Amino acid sequence: MDGDIIFPVVVKPVDNAGGRGMSICRNREELSEGIAKAMQFSDASTPEIEEFVEGLEVFVYYIVRNGVPTFSMASEIATMRDSERGMPYHVANRFPSHQIERIRRECDEAFVRLIRSLGIQNGYIGLQCFVTDDRVMVHDPTFRIDGANDHEVAKMITGVSDVEFYIAHALTGTFGTQEDAGKLHYRSDWPIFIQVGSILGPGIIGEFSGLDDVANIDGVYEVEQVRRVGDEMKLATSTLSQIGAQIKLQAPDSQTLRVRLQEVFDAISVKDVNGADMVVPLNLDELAFGKTQDK
């Protein structure tokens, strides 16, 4: 089997999610360890081996009404890795993705054909993609309300959301109105929204402060404390397990977003029981400007 595998690869359980049981493997020894780990996290004791793609993870959203798909949004998941082999931490969701114009230009026609070929008449479709310098690869389509709460962002920008469309369809049989559907069509002048986590390293939390100050920063519209004093942070068991707090904020442009992100992380203080800083520093330039840091 190994002779047919081009490393690196991702090994994961076929029936789990959120990064649980996943490993990045770069040789045969790591592959054997990754398979054993994946089987431990799989009810079916079955591992899945995939190509490891080094690229951006982007969600592309389409609203479909009466059989007509229309490009709505593309968001981006920002991650960081704890080690050479560790699965990435989920750091942030950014609306829109830095790659949104490229994806709309290069992929819209193909994505519309795909959705039409499936015979979907009404709904909000998410296409999870890996984006590299030379390709955009769809690897997980979803036909549900997304866990990134993109409907909240849509509501704040346009006054309507896909959740309201689904409720209307359940009650009346009509998937919203054409006028409201038009409001969910992407426009390049929409502001930037980001949901970012304060990532914590291993240790027992002895002090957690600053979130009240964060709530008063311009653009911040929601703050949620996920971990509390006394909680023990261990090595990552899933992509979300290291988040100490979630902050949601908006900004009119990337420069303003960068300033506000700095204010947020300057305000947050988390120390372990020995007084050591537990907050893992993030690359705020990448969150604001993208990996090219084209300012």
Residue ranges of model-derived segments:
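Active-site nucleotide/adenylate-binding loops and adjacent lid/helix of ATP-dependent enzymes
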Residues: 1-47, 54, 65-67, 93-109, ...
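A short glycine-rich, hydrophobically flanked beta-strand micro-motif that places a catalytic Asp/Glu
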Residues: 50, 121-133, 178, 279-284
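Protein kinase-like catalytic core scaffold
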Residues: 9, 70, 137-140
